[in-house]
Amino acid sequence: MRVVFALVFTILVAFASEISIATYNVQNLFDCKDDGSEYLDFKVGVSKWDCEAADSKLQRTRQVINALNTDIIALQEIENEQVLKALVSDSEYKFVSFTKEKTSPVGLGLISKLQPSGSEVFKVPNVKTRNILKVIFETEGKKFSIFVNHFPTYKNGINMQKKAEKTLRTALGKEKN
């Protein structure tokens, strides 16, 4: 049985409002359309992946999202923005942000019940995948940012991880308290 790990945070904004935040690696949420960047395991006609498998994975992921029931959820390993929108259709999550490199099979997303006031993408230099997504929120006159990232795997080398870490540190350094 696969165990789903989600890290849930609750933050207090100016000690007045409570906002719950989670992060969830959906572990390759793909549709059944070939856009050319899929992993081989998710190519229809080449693997066991088909529309039925894609719909089943979408429904199971939607159940986890609904069970989390947080205000904001950062998501990793989503194929495209259309899959992200399908995931939250008919839900309380009305706002989505997404980033993906053209050559990457998966991207990062954020879904929210709160309307973001902006977003920014940080490209990790010399790494073909794994942008860092920053989504900005404002509530009760206070701004806060959520950074969504998914560092390269260790098998790709520690240097790629260090580049991602440096990019995130630089982005965080630009934040005002």
List where the protein language model places each region:
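Structured beta-strand-rich core segments of catalytic domains in phosphoester-bond hydrolases
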Residues: 78-143, 151
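Sec-dependent N-terminal signal peptides
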Residues: 3-15
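Extracytoplasmic, non-cytosolic globular domains
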Residues: 133-177
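Second-shell loop/turn segments in exported
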Residues: 46-52, 69-75, 98, 121-122, ...
